[in-house]
Amino acid sequence: MTEGRSSAAAAASLWERDAEIATVTRTLDALRADQSSAGSLLVFRGEAGLGKTALLTETRRIAERRGCTVWSARGGETLKSVPFNVVRQLLQPALVSLLPEEAREYLGDWYDIAGPALGIVDPGEGSVDPQYVCDGLVAAVRRLARREWPLVLIIDDAHWADQETLRWLAAFAERLDDLSVLVVVARRPGEVSGESARHLEAIAAAAGRPVNNLSALTPEATAGLTRATVGRHADDPFCREVWAVTGGNPYDTVELLAKVLDSEVQPVESRAGELRALNRAARGGGLVDRLNGLGIDATQFAWAAAILGTGISVDLVARLASMSTDVAERCAELLRTARILTEPEPVAGTETEAGELEFVHPLIASAVYNSIPPAVCTAMHGVAAQILTETGHGAAEASRHLLKVHPDDDEELVEQLREAARDHLAVGAPDAARRCLERALEEPPRPEVHAHVLLELGHATLLTAPSVTIEHLQSALAMPGLDGGQRVDAVVRLSQALLHNDQLEEAVRTVEAEAARHGAGPVKLRLQAVQFMWEGIHGETVSQERSRALAELAGTCTGRDNSERALLILRGFDAMTHGENAEEVLQLCDRALVNGRLAPGLGWTDGEWGIELLMMLGSAYAYADRLDRAESLFAEALRAYTGAGWRGGHLSLANAFLGLAYRRQGRLRDAETTLREALSLAERVGRGLPLYWSSTCGLVDTLLARGHVEEAWSIAEQYGFAPPYPSTIVLPDIRSVRGRLLLAVGRTEEGINELEAAEKRGGGRARGKPGKPGGGGGGFARVPAGPVPPRPGIPRPCSSRRLPLS
């Protein structure tokens, strides 16, 4: 009976789907025709029960019949918080067939980045940039897809896919032009919001064709299905009522007709009035009543299965529901007969454990889960987390259950969630880490631990959401718990977040206030160095008094520790921006190095000082004409961030400043390539931030130097390279580059105004020795405009004019 109904359900869901099946068939034929052809993306959208899964099953059947390899995965309503869950499902056939050394060979340089997210490599310590992991997954799947041509990727219930998978899928969908693969996605309309919704919109846009919206069955199709199921003698009024009751929903229609058969209702007009009651019993509250009618044991078995969501087995459910194996086996059979649970269909290339079960339809799974009393639900999630932990699974795997447990001042749960957050960060899932730490705060943590959880929450969001980081770190510093070095680290990290959020004045005040709390010593010296560092890149706070104070403090430093080395770098940068002797600038910078290299603890990925100090060091070398050392520093930054998996703002700035070094060397083609990469990365982090301005300004400047005026103007228009400008120093100077651009396109008066504003702004800096190689009007500012071909009506800028770019 169950098998027959499953076949009927599948057949019903394909009624009136000829157009969709024809689209699938044509696309598959195109895929198989040419391995060099572009890839395709099909998106099917429809309400629950309209036959999306049946259509994807038919897609699999057609594809396999044509000799295609098919990988498939499915989102789950209770699994949305599990990072990379769906993409791991999707790639399981490929991953289980590869030995570790084969996987490393196929994934190449991306093995250590994508491997932890896919669960085939143990993650390292610390945080990994989620964008880099996403890029690694895109590269990994592209390599695997080329090996398996012709390949079809099927993702069902994408509205319930985890955010990390959706981010990968959106990025992957944008790169199908040179990859012969078919991607088929099915989802419900609505159901999601925030980042997940934006990713789904991007996926639909990447399809390059209208989304296939599935419609309900017409009255004629419903009548045909009714007669095919209950007999040709079903009369027209009865068939019409079936359609009216179900709205033409294929799933509801099949379930209702199954009830008609079970109840032995004759399909005639006189019995049509009974259909609405039968339909209510098939789903929602009626389904719950039907479940309760099977007995308390069967009900608890179904509840436990709904809590698990995936990997449902009789043994595991028995343990979760606290029942014997014999009772659990009997309950499983009852639920199979009642069409609540079923055995999953075997899929080529995947491993299915003996006795594994799944819900017949997601609607049933949702109804069962939502029927669990809240107190019972949270308790069962707690038991499920405990079972996973006891069976050797990590805190990250148990965290989806821990998130559902009712807050109860549980110190152990707080520690488990903190551990899960660390695991999530290590695979590039900061949003999952954030959810764990936010839930830990609700427990709540002990007073002496609370600030530490907030600090960890601030670290979890630093690379992706500076504004959120600021809120958490300010809260952590406002309560007891952070002492000594931890508090200083938190203050410095907060000031970095404020800087990246374009709140530089507040960043300076934050460090200044903390420095006032300490007496003379290494801690105070470090905070003073950080304060000078932020002031040094804040164009509005530069003054002669500040420079004198910095010179006096740096004059006492010999480079004995990193605080002294930082002050030497800051003094060298300040001297360069004020046009002091270039040789003195270089001597200061060289004294900050150890045997010509960055000191331990001052590396590009070391967290104590951050990226800004080393960018100042490299800039000082660049504008003091030690271009070899500047290039070496920025190239080292690129390698360090790439190796560490930091593909956000850090890598963008590394590219931007390496582009600056190339620009100063006259390697304009290399500069343009590097700066375009910097801008692409910066846009992912967010427009308007200082790193975004650095990339845009550098690229416009380089295009002008290459004589590509129209392209420079196009970039400026596209990326908002116009006032209002940020308060931070940007290299090269924004106003100077903008002024040259305006002159180049013939907007002479506006260009002159910008250049005069740049000169006025730079006047306070460019004092002292303007003729020296590092002078404010020279070394720091002397970036020749480059050859710009004369154009009618556009005055040619004077390439010999020295402009203040600081």
Predicted stretch roles:
Residues 337, 431, 465, 507, ...:
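Helix-coil-helix junctions within alpha-helical repeat/solenoid scaffolds
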Residues 1-27, 112-125, 273-283:
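Conserved adenine-nucleotide phosphate-binding loops and their immediately adjacent elements
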Residues 168-207, 211-213:
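Sensor-1/coupling segment of RecA-like P-loop NTPase cores
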Residues 64-66, 204, 243, 258-261, ...:
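Internal alpha-solenoid helical repeat scaffolds
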Residues 44:
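Hydrophobic anchor at the beta1->P-loop junction of P-loop NTPases
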Residues 2-3, 85-152, 201, 223, ...:
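Conserved Walker-type P-loop NTP-binding/catalytic site
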Residues 50, 221-229, 233-435, 439-442:
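Short secondary-structure boundary elements
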Residues 47-81, 85-88:
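P-loop NTPase Walker A phosphate-binding motif
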